[in-house]
Amino acid sequence: MENITPLRKQYLDIKKNYPEAIVFFRLGDFYETFEEDARIAARELEIVLTSREMGKGLKVPLAGIPYHALDNYLSRLINRGYKVAICEQVTKPGETKGLVKRQVTRLVTPGTVVEPNLLDSKQNNFLLSLYLTEDSCGLAFADISTSEFGCTQLDINGLEAEINRLNPAEIILPKSQSLNLPLHLKATISKLDGYYFEADVARERLLKHFECQNLSAYGCENLPLAVSAAGALLNYLEETQKSSLKQLERLAAYTISDYMQIDSHTLSNLEIFRSSGGNSLKGSLLGVLDQTKTAMGGRLLRKFLGQPLLRQEDIEKRLSAVDYFFEESLARASLAKALGQIADMERIANRIRQKTILPKELISLKNSLETVSAIHRQFGLMPPPRLAYFLNGLKPLPEMLDIVNEAINDDPPSTLGEGKVIRSGFNPEMDKLCSLAGDARTFLSQMEAREREQTGIKSLKLGYNRVFGYYIEVSNANLADIPQNYIRKQTLVNAERFITPELKEYENLILNAKERLLEMETGLYEQVLNQLGGFYSALLSNAAALASLDVLSAFAEVAVRNGYVRPLFHSENSLVIHRGRHPMVEQGLGYGSFAANDISLSAEDCQIIILTGPNMAGKSTYLKQTALIVLMAQIGSYVPAETAELCLTDRIFSRIGAREDLSAGQSTFMVEMVETASILNTATSRSLLILDEIGRGTSTYDGLAIAQAVVEYIHSQPSLHAKTLFATHYHELVELANYLPRVKNYNIAVSEDRGEVVFLHRIVPGGVDKSYGIHVAKLAGLPGWVIKRAYEVLTELENPAKKEPKIRNCQPQLLLPLTEQTSALAEEIKGLEIESLTPLAALNKLYELKKKAEEQGL
């Protein structure tokens, strides 16, 4: 350590505290990275990797970025899961003896980003904290850019669905715990010492933060696991932010059962937040419904979709507001135009609280406040009864508007220090400093003209740089003409630079004025932010009201465009949808092109629909559209149908499509059975089940047996009796309607004409005994020979007189004749009593048969 430079020692002292982060070390106008951090930065940011001598014979890898480009480079690292420690110079050069003092002012992690240009405006940036036990979990989340802070305690089986709903950027866990994330989630996992999750430690941290004696007011006094997660989250934020967390002034405890429960598989199958094909917004329900104009509205819509309501009163409030905007097209259009001028007031409020807001953002706030006043004049003075509930928080803030108008210039720069942020007339002393700094250009221009005239040197010029300050530059050819009061300051190749006593005196005056100007402008700006901070809660209330109006008017806009209707709710356990449609498929086809269908499900007489018919005919679409209509209704949206009479549904479950979980070592069939078991164990009589091809991942008879048993269980189990749509290729299941009174058969209508098959996409009563699989294979482009041969084999299989189809050679030379050896081997296999073999014995027998086959050259 004796041979390293003081700067190197300072860096190492800082770096040892942040071993898992890339340290951005401020050196003048650059942030530098060293050693392995530099190699990572050079690779990920595509910047030059160089080196710097930082001790006797010690060259250290180095890569740097300009300080003003921090956000751009920071976003690239954060998006790739890195953590970045921002190490700033906290004293000025010359203020202290020796090195400039440096310290980490903030640790930026994926879940603690607050910079607007690094965030998705319509999506929360959640930091999630989890504390797991064998069968339960404490969960807390926070978005420090919006001040949201919540917690819950839930069954471990519901954890994946809640993680999917929140879609966090980062997850905190105790060091002793681990978590398998769904493949589509890109969250960074951060480990925290288990000490911070201990009940007493976490509780004390929350009590200290909220300055209270107990947590009853926050609803989590009796949720110990939730308290552990929330307290640990606060500790993590305190460590990373290095600043006050006052914006987290409320902890909202909630219960999963307060909302419709949708498991992670159903969220994915129904494509609520992202399409299954491209994993994008397009093709998802969110993509159809998102006609919001504000960032706050976009985030609220996501929350609505993840937490459909269970109280009819709350749903009706939303639907009544949608009614108003649906009927009042001029009001809807006017509001949409106004909302388009609203900035992200929620995040602006928090940046004011954190004192990180830029001057230009205050102008965006000013414009938004003016628009709030206009919206209030339109709706708030005499609130339409159907909107009154959602207008409660909408209050003009003229005092806040006055503060910005009086203090901030209309077109301020992005940074402080030039005297152009604070409005002229706001502070007389600052006006004088601005005048002095502004007069500098005039003075220098006049002095340059005077010196040229007095010396006769026409090429003489005055200039300035940060190293040498102000100077007079004279070319070498004119050096003989310089006056005696010129003092040499710098020698160039073709010129000399000089200073005069007059210029030096003015330089000191100007530089002192600029330094004083920066200090004064910074101080005045902070005073303005302190004043604006007093309106924090009122600003958030306005943001919440605008977000609600935005979402509900967007629902109306979508309904008008797509011909949706208001759903009606009743107390009976039934749903009746007339000419329902799939919202995403319809949008892809174009309005009016989708084949609409009816559905009627009732716990009393038609509890289960067995749906048969060919692939590609629309079975899955029919199942999904029913679930989507139910979900849309319970978030307060109109629905794609001619009429919809619904009951409240507590859970939606889906088992659709084949999926492997290779990371857990589970086959497609095992995944299917696990999901089915979960559904049967947790569904209630108020649930909606959509099940597609249960049992298809195993042998025909095993699959048929499982499918039939599942239907019988749903029908007959007293605690279940869930309304169910059951699509299947097992045509034998249509017989269940003969002895299970609440099972009904429906099928996808097909038209056959001279061997040609046309799928009509209509759902009609009755079962079918054909799958039309070969027709689908033909549409897929299988060779003609294969299609022709498949029809022949199908005919033979359907003829009871012929038990096995004859094998016809397509390429005889590729088919090997049976030999005595193969016959003997076949007989040995046939003679095995598989049921009596243990797994180990079966494996040994398999190896034995394989060895015999290899020895016989088979």
Curated annotation (Swiss-Prot):
One of its GO terms (biological process) is mismatch repair. GO terms for molecular function: ATP binding; ATP-dependent DNA damage sensor activity; damaged DNA binding; mismatched DNA binding. GO terms for cellular component: cytosol. Keywords: ATP-binding, DNA damage, DNA repair, DNA-binding, Nucleotide-binding. ATP binds at G613, P614, N615, M616, A617, G618, K619, S620. It comes from the Bacteria. This protein is involved in the repair of mismatches in DNA. It is possible that it carries out the mismatch recognition step. This protein has a weak ATPase activity. NCBIfam families: mutS1, PRK05399.1. This is DNA mismatch repair protein MutS. It comes from Dehalococcoides mccartyi (strain ATCC BAA-2266 / KCTC 15142 / 195) (Dehalococcoides ethenogenes (strain 195)).
